[in-house]
Amino acid sequence: DRTVSRGLGDVYKRQDADWVIEAVVERIDIKHKLYSQIDKVRSPDSIISSNTSTIPLSILTQEMSDTMKADFCITHFFNPVRFMRLLEIVETPTMNKDKMSGLRDFCQNELGKGIVNCNDTPGFIGNRIGVYAMQVAMYEALERGLPVEIADALFGRPLGIPKTGVFGLYDLIGIDLMKDVLASFKKELQENDPFMDVVKPHPLVEKLLEKGFNGNKGPGGFYQTTIVDGDEHVKAMNTSDMSYYDFDKVDLEI
């Protein structure tokens, strides 16, 4: 009945939590350290899950106790969680079946999620396809010199994708987080995987990160939002010199 935990301090305070969801950055060293701390204080009746979007369960559970492994799974909620119905679940062969059944029932009937059961592979289903598509679209758009707002209009509603497109979605997710996501894919995928052709962050992304531009949560990214006379004003980035400019809504005749 209450939303629990934005930090480990809250976990210590809520040792009676029925379900603890880990949602830290996509770095396995940080996750392993957090799991070790959670295992010391959690209720033996609790379920622990990760909101990872890319890291396989076999990697997440490498340093876990057997008891925690039996209570651990992946619950990948899609962003924004309050609107997106999709929920990917990956479970271990040793996961407590009664707890897993209860978790599925809660997610479907109380949270209103549509559950997709996934194999334990990098990126599961959604991000294995989606992140690859984003990377290909980004590389193609930048290579062809497409303005970001034009690229997003093309890689958006016409393809049945949210209007954020690729560059807007990068800003929404966080450019720094996307770099961690790509690093995770690079570590786990085989060298002959087609994803490896586009898994490296684009040089423009590296330049943005060097300037501290992480997307919506920072001073800007491929778009920059400012407040003008109390109203939000969005500018697009010129990818050739990283300056920002005003733009009109793109209306494609498709």
Where would I find each of the regions flagged by the language model?
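Substrate-binding/catalytic subdomain of NAD(P)-dependent oxidoreductase enzymes
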Residues: 90, 116-254
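Rossmann-fold dinucleotide-binding core
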Residues: 47-128, 163, 230, 245-248, ...
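Generic detector of well-ordered alpha-helical packing
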Residues: 2, 23, 52, 77-80, ...
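Single conserved hydrophobic/aromatic residue that forms the stacking wall/gate
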Residues: 1-12
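Loop/helix-junction capping segments adjacent to catalytic residues or to phosphate/diphosphate-binding pockets
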Residues: 11, 28-29, 97, 219
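Rossmann-fold NAD(P) dinucleotide-binding segment
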Residues: 13-66, 70-71
